[in-house]
Amino acid sequence: MVTPRRDSGKDRPSLKDARILVVEARYYEDIADELLRGATAAIAAAQAEAEVVTVPGALEIPQAVAILVEAAAREARPYDAVVALGCVIRGETGHYDIVAGESARALMDLSVLLRLPLGNGILTVETEAQAQARARVSEMNKGGGAAEAALAVLALKRAKAAERPDRTIGFTPRRTAETQE
């Protein structure tokens, strides 16, 4: 089995002032507890601030992220990154495919549209045993991994902003002869 390479965070710029939104679905309580434990430990290790908000299920996570990110920006206290935590276990119907696919798609859409670093820690598994193994901090620690992913992208975003402070990060329209007139 191949061992995944993890970002140790040791070469990362300080994230001490970072505000990280953690939105967790509590549908499977024991799994949610472990995912949250891993995520908050990773955020604390980066000396960032975590704000945890709970929603019923995975499909509600993208909605909550959109609402909370907008509200925080309005209050001039924007989030620097988001961590989404939850679990979807395949059942007997096609509901699993809808919840797993749509929650992931909506989160990616939000992340790209808002240029907001986001770690997706929504487990999509066949069995509860698989979910527990992936959630446990002592095993696969997917909650911690999701937080580390968000923190790594935030560090990249900050590093690029520091290189070019006069420019925003993201796409800029290409200027052509027609647009310059």
Swiss-Prot record:
List of residues binding (2S)-2-hydroxy-3-oxobutyl phosphate: E92, T93, R134
Top-level taxonomic group: Bacteria
Single biological process term from Gene Ontology: riboflavin biosynthetic process
Gene3D superfamilies xref list: Lumazine/riboflavin synthase
Entry binding sites for 5-amino-6-(D-ribitylamino)uracil: Y27, A58, L59, E60, C87, V88, I89, N120
Catalytic residues as annotated in Swiss-Prot or TrEMBL: H95 (proton donor)
A Gene Ontology molecular function term of the record: 6,7-dimethyl-8-ribityllumazine synthase activity
Enzyme Commission number(s): 2.5.1.78
Enzymatic reactions: (2S)-2-hydroxy-3-oxobutyl phosphate + 5-amino-6-(D-ribitylamino)uracil = 6,7-dimethyl-8-(1-D-ribityl)lumazine + phosphate + 2 H2O + H(+)
Metabolic or biological pathway: Cofactor biosynthesis; riboflavin biosynthesis; riboflavin from 2-hydroxy-3-oxobutyl phosphate and 5-amino-6-(D-ribitylamino)uracil: step 1/2
Pfam family, one: DMRL_synthase
Enzyme class: transferase
Gene Ontology CC entries for this record: cytosol; riboflavin synthase complex
Disulfide bonds: none
Annotated InterPro entries: LS, LS/RS, LS/RS_sf
Keywords assigned by UniProt, alphabetized: Riboflavin biosynthesis, Transferase
Job of this protein: Catalyzes the formation of 6,7-dimethyl-8-ribityllumazine by condensation of 5-amino-6-(D-ribitylamino)uracil with 3,4-dihydroxy-2-butanone 4-phosphate. This is the penultimate step in the biosynthesis of riboflavin.
Protein family per UniProt: Belongs to the DMRL synthase family.
Entry-linked HAMAP family: Lumazine_synth (MF_00178)
Name of this chain's protein: 6,7-dimethyl-8-ribityllumazine synthase
Record gene name: ribH
